[in-house]
Amino acid sequence: MIKEETVSYFQTFDGVMAESDKEEELDATKAKVEKVREENEKLKLLLSTILNNYNSLQMQVSKVLGQQQGASSMELDHIDRQDENNDYDVDISLRLGRSEQKISKKEENKVDKISTKNVEESKDKRSALGFGFQIQSYEASKLDDLCRQVKLANAENKCVSSRKDVKSVRNENHQDVLEEHEQTGLKKTRVCVKASCEDPSINDGCQWRKYGQKTAKTNPLPRAYYRCSMSSNCPVRKQVQRCGEEETSAFMTTYEGNHDHPLPMEASHMAAGTSAAASLLQSGSSSSSSSTSASLSYFFPFHHFSISTTNSHPTVTLDLTRPNYPNQLPDDYPLSSSSFSLNFSSPDPPPPSSHDHTLNFSGLRTQAPLSTDSLLARYRTRLSGQQ
DNA sequence: CGGTTTTGACCCGCGC
DNA sequence: GCGCGGGTCAAAACCG
């Protein structure tokens, strides 16, 4: 009897213990959940702070860029004079991005009439092409030099819209822009990006609306025409053409024009490299080809790029399907201290790395870019996972 | 229902 | 001046 009672006592005790254990476990779990919630709140706060900071920074950058563009033409004159004094090899007559000789008499008259207006307006339209790459942890001094070159080049970047722009934009708000472009007789710099990608609609950070498709005579594969739809008046266009019939074949994307609106984070990150390429191309008049080439090597150190002028369109072509390894880098490229992480669905492995440089075409297959974007994305994922 | 894509027609620069 | 061909328009279809 005693044994039975003892056993039943211990069974009851075990039951009580088990229940109390469960309660403790429950409490602990609740506490954990509470902690996670608190952390979640903190992260939310942090995220909103980061976003606020980013937005305010973006505003400041736009402001500063606007001011610098206004001042850059004066600065350019100053630098040109310095160049002359330094006996640099400068070919002033070469003006890539312009085709002044093609201006008709009719257009010349218009230019005379509105040239003063153009000088003022063009200052506001020297924004960078809205695409490019993200480059992290770059040597500050080198970047400063390059950015300086880019700014100077942007001052020269007076592009013209072709007749298609005249047709496409009929509202009066755009008329000034169109007249300006028409009168100067200039053609826009184009940047071609060749990338092997299964999806032709490369997400380069902007929103695009397809407005046409055409099969060219010389190429049986259709070419698609897209217009930037982030702003109703944005003049930026792109053409996408597949380079081969296979599904895996590369796409050639040709960008043309300047965005008239703030770019999203991805796009503004992307803007640096190709914008630099376009700008450097257009600054070919004031810098030697070797220095231009070297500068592009900094922005596109592991891929082929070429410069050409087709149909009076100065064109920078970036071939992301063909890795360009360090033997082709400029001598002073800081390979020893940093490296590059890039994976554009290219079968070739990226060079060995100790620091990260990231080219980030979101939508293309990129490899672990620890950019602000990805950090924010991770935060968002974590937050949504916890809620 | 609003935004996007499709697609035939049209425009116009350019070469001959 | 004419024809070719790249680029754009715009209405209809499609989609979420």
Swiss-Prot record:
Compositionally biased spans, kind Low complexity: 329-346
Domain of life: Eukaryota
Keyword Repressor: no
GO molecular function: DNA-binding transcription factor activity; sequence-specific DNA binding
Region (Disordered): 322-366
One Gene Ontology cellular component: nucleus
Record's keyword terms, sorted: DNA-binding, Nucleus, Transcription, Transcription regulation
Residue ranges the UniProt entry marks as DNA-binding: 197-264
Cellular compartments annotated: Nucleus
Gene3D superfamilies: WRKY domain
InterPro entries documented for this protein: WRKY_dom, WRKY_dom_sf, WRKY_plant
Keyword Nucleus: yes
Known role: Transcription factor. Interacts specifically with the W box (5'-(T)TGAC[CT]-3'), a frequently occurring elicitor-responsive cis-acting element.
Protein name stated in the entry: Probable WRKY transcription factor 36
Gene: WRKY36
